[in-house]
């Protein structure tokens, strides 16, 4: 997926679990543009993971084996915590 195709990335952010939508969509909407190109590529790789894995990682019930994905999960958690709750 092209890092500049925001419509497609936005669609990929929509998940089958509400809990994931609450974590991933605000991060994409508020933070994606400020990421480096490398971070954008890692975020897209994260979106290619299965929902159960994403849920476990974002809810701190495990962590990805891939160090880059782990850093992205922590970045999402940190930025969402700093921003506070947002309506989606």
Swiss-Prot record:
Disulfide links within the chain: none
Cellular location(s): Cytoplasm
Superkingdom of source: Bacteria
GO CC field: cytoplasm
UniProt xrefs under SUPFAM superfamilies: YgfY-like
Sorted UniProt keywords: Chaperone, Cytoplasm
GO biological process: succinate metabolic process
InterPro entries registered for this protein in UniProt: SDH (IPR005631), SDH_sf (IPR036714), SdhE_FAD_assembly_factor (IPR050531)
Keyword set includes ATP-binding: no
Similarity comment: Belongs to the SdhE FAD assembly factor family.
Subunit-level organization: Monomer.
Its job: An FAD assembly protein, which accelerates covalent attachment of the cofactor into other proteins. Plays an essential role in the assembly of succinate dehydrogenase (SDH, respiratory complex II), an enzyme complex that is a component of both the tricarboxylic acid cycle and the electron transport chain, and which couples the oxidation of succinate to fumarate with the reduction of ubiquinone (coenzyme Q) to ubiquinol. Required for flavinylation (covalent attachment of FAD) of the flavoprotein subunit SdhA of SDH and other flavinylated proteins as well.
Record protein name field: FAD assembly factor SdhE
Protein encoded by which gene: sdhE
């Amino acid at each position: 997926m092209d890092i500049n195709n925001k419509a497609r990335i936005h669609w990929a952010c929509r998940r089958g679990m509400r809990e994931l939508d609450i974590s991933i969509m605000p991060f994409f909407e508020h933070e994606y543009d400020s990421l480096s190109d490398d971070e954008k590529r890692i975020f897209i790789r994260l979106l290619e993971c299965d929902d159960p894995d994403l849920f476990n990682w974002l809810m701190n019930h495990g962590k990805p084996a891939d160090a880059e994905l782990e850093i992205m999960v922590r970045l999402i958690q940190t930025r969402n915590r700093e921003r506070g709750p947002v309506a989606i």
